[in-house]
C-alpha cells in the first residue's frame, strides 16, 4: 500500500524491508540492533539506538522507555512503574523515576489515535 510506512535494514542475510506496523520493538546489544517482529521473527542489523530513534521519531508511534529499547505503542498492553508489557507479554524495563514520563507519552499517543480512555 502506498500509505504503508516501512524501514529498510541492512542485515546479515541481505537488505530487508519491514513494515513499521509489524515491528513490536527494537533492542540494542552493543552495536547490534535486534528488530522483533509481530510474527515472532527477529532481524539483526548494526547501528545505534539513538540514530534509529531519530529516524523513527516523525512517525510518532514509538516510545523509548529505556536507552536500550524502542517500543511500538500499538503493541503496548500495560505500563507499570517498572516496565512496559507488550501484547506478546515481553516486559521492557523502565528506569526508576521515568514511569510518569513514559505514561504521559503513551497517553498523548492514545489521544492522537482517538483511543477510548476509561
Report the location of each language-model feature:
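Conserved binding/recognition cores within well-folded domains
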Residues: 1-87, 93
Amino acid at each position: 500500500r502506498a500509505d504503508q510506512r516501512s524501514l529498510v535494514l541492512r542485515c546479515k542475510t541481505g537488505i530487508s524491508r519491514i513494515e513499521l506496523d509489524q515491528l513490536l520493538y527494537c533492542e540494542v546489544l552493543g552495536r547490534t540492533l535486534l528488530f522483533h517482529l509481530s510474527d515472532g521473527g527477529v532481524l539483526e542489523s548494526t547501528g545505534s539506538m539513538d540514530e534509529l530513534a531519530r529516524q523513527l521519531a516523525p512517525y510518532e508511534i514509538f516510545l523509548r522507555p529505556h536507552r536500550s529499547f524502542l517500543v511500538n505503542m500499538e503493541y503496548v498492553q500495560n505500563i507499570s512503574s517498572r516496565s512496559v508489557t507488550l501484547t506478546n507479554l515481553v516486559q521492557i524495563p523502565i528506569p526508576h523515576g521515568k514511569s510518569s514520563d513514559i505514561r504521559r507519552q503513551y497517553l498523548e499517543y492514545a489521544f492522537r489515535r482517538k483511543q477510548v480512555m476509561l
